[in-house]
From Swiss-Prot:
Protein name: NADPH:adrenodoxin oxidoreductase, mitochondrial
Origin species: Rattus norvegicus (Rat)
Known function: Also acts as a ferredoxin--NADP(+) reductase essential for coenzyme Q biosynthesis: together with FDX2, transfers the electrons required for the hydroxylation reaction performed by COQ6.
Subunit-structure text: Monomer. Interacts directly with FDX1.
Pfam families in alphabetical order: Pyr_redox_2
């Protein structure tokens, strides 16, 4: 939900929302106990991904009169569940059913097509609502910050995922898959998702919700080998065993692992946590054990391959002789220093060049500041907070990735969002939030109308949803995603 432009607001223009010097000396508007008998708590959630919906769900469940408005910059809800989860993982998207139940509550409303920080400011939301929860996620990617990063053929994994998942702003990406080799920098689940989509036989994706445009490009792909590169070793990979197992079993492919990367690892995994131990053991078996007859036969017929390169840190993107495209990546060879969580990769002084025609950066997502009135830590990429309470901003909260950083799976975000909701409800009960009625969406609707902004509702989304499902039926897909904002608005009569 990053703003396109900044506007600085004077605190005097927003009575009752000046930051507290400390929680022990509240301003008059915050000290009166909240009367649950007289007032309906009006709560605003910014962002309709998992963090936003789980926060709303918990608030509605644990306060019988609270009303929650969920603001979203896209025309459609569900955030990374729709635009981030891989098309061949439909089971992960089942949480949409739960989110839909929340959105259909008569105490919840979806306000799509509203960019907080541009169409409406956070101080305006704080003036209209008793509490505001920022749950807008991490929509940017971590830059590599190495020479040549701007060359054509260097793509962020986040943009690539958005492209094949139908995120409107990524539809002009047009990745060139005419090369033989792709390199992915980073060894998390997103890196494995991207590798799997690049190497999966296209016919296996035909019945998923991948866009037809992406499927057409993948059908023409010449990519045969994908290298997945990490700075550290097998014990430090960020992907999970489910994603690794999918790669190992991927039809028509074979894994390439260097047994020397795993020397002495068996003894070092005895005391690591069980999930990490099982993951490392699977890597060890794949790298060092001779495959059985059936598996050997399968690998012999494989036309594509993927490999994990450990102890390599990106140093420079190498251009083609004419300087017009990526031709490879120069990697610094690393070794590990430290133990446990403090283990870090340090360069040995050696380098190696890895040729490729496509370079995908998957070194992490990053949140953006949403509004000049909201504190933001650019180094950590989060909103400074204590248990979800934004520092020096009573009545302002955060949940999800913008609260803790872009780590964990959907269930991690669920737990985190529930905790923020609990803190908010605790503050509400303790009288730490503004007393008296607040106008909620009524006030914001008037502002948006004056500014020519037309929000879309959840019933509008359900019309788009029905259209997507109908378009998918012709080709046996669960849906064909709408990717053009203008077309979506036309379908809604906006």
């Amino acid at each position: 939900m990053a703003p396109r432009c900044w506007r600085w607001w004077s605190w005097s223009a927003w009575p009752g929302v000046r930051p507290l010097p400390s929680r022990s000396t509240p301003t008059p508007g915050f000290c009166k106990k909240f009367s649950t008998q007289e007032t309906t708590p009006q709560i605003c959630v910014v962002g309709s991904g998992p963090a936003g919906f789980y926060t709303a769900q918990h608030l509605l469940k644990h306060h019988t009169r609270a009303h929650v408005d969920i603001y979203e910059k896209q025309l459609v809800p569900f955030g990374l569940v729709r635009f981030g989860v891989a098309p061949d993982h439909p089971e992960v998207k089942n949480v949409i059913n739960t989110f839909t139940q929340t959105a259909r509550s008569d105490r919840c409303a979806f306000r799509g097509n509203v960019v907080v920080g541009r169409d409406v400011s956070v101080p305006e939301l704080r003036e209209a609502y008793h509490a505001v929860v920022l749950s807008y996620g991490a929509e940017d990617h971590q830059p590599l910050e190495i020479p040549g990063e701007e060359l054509p053929g260097v793509v962020s994994a986040r943009a690539f995922v958005g492209w094949y998942n139908g995120l409107p702003e990524n539809q002009k990406l047009a990745p060139d898959l005419s090369c033989d080799t792709a390199v992915i920098l980073g060894q998390g689940n997103v890196a494995l998702d991207v590798a799997r989509i690049l190497l999966t036989p296209p016919e296996h994706l035909e019945k998923t919700d991948i866009t037809e445009v992406a499927l057409g490009v993948l059908r023409q792909s010449r990519v045969k080998t994908v290298w997945i590169v990490g700075r550290r070793g097998p014990l430090q990979v960020a992907f999970t065993i489910k994603e690794l197992r999918e790669m190992i079993q991927l039809p028509g492919t074979q894994p390439i692992l260097d047994p020397s990367d795993f020397l002495g690892l068996q003894d070092r995994i005895k005391d690591v946590p069980r999930p990490r131990k099982r993951l490392t053991e699977l890597l060890l078996r794949t790298a060092t054990e001779k495959p059985g007859v059936e598996e050997a036969a399968r690998r012999a017929l494989a036309s594509r391959a993927w490999g994990l390169r450990f102890f390599r840190s990106p140093q420079q993107v190498l251009p083609t002789p004419d300087g017009r495209r990526v031709a490879g990546i120069r990697l610094a060879v690393t070794r590990l220093e430290g133990v446990g969580e403090s283990t870090r990769a340090v360069p040995t002084g050696d380098v190696e060049d890895l040729p490729c025609g496509l370079l995908l950066s998957s070194v992490g997502y990053k949140s953006r500041p949403i509004d000049p009135s909201v504190p933001f830590d650019p180094k950590l990429g989060i909103i400074p907070n204590t248990e979800g309470r934004v520092v020096n901003a009573p009545g302002l909260y955060c949940s999800g990735w913008v609260k803790r950083g872009p780590t964990g799976v959907i269930t991690t975000t669920m737990t985190d969002s529930f905790l923020t909701s609990q803190v908010l409800l605790k503050d509400l009960k303790a009288g730490l939030l503004p007393s008296g009625p607040r106008p909620g969406y009524t006030a914001i609707q008037a502002l948006l109308s004056d500014r020519g902004v037309r929000p879309v509702s959840f019933s509008d989304w359900e019309k788009l949803d029905a259209e997507e499902v109908a378009r998918g039926q012709g080709t046996g897909k669960p849906r064909e995603k709408l990717v053009d904002r203008r077309e979506m608005l036309q379908l809604l009569g906006h």
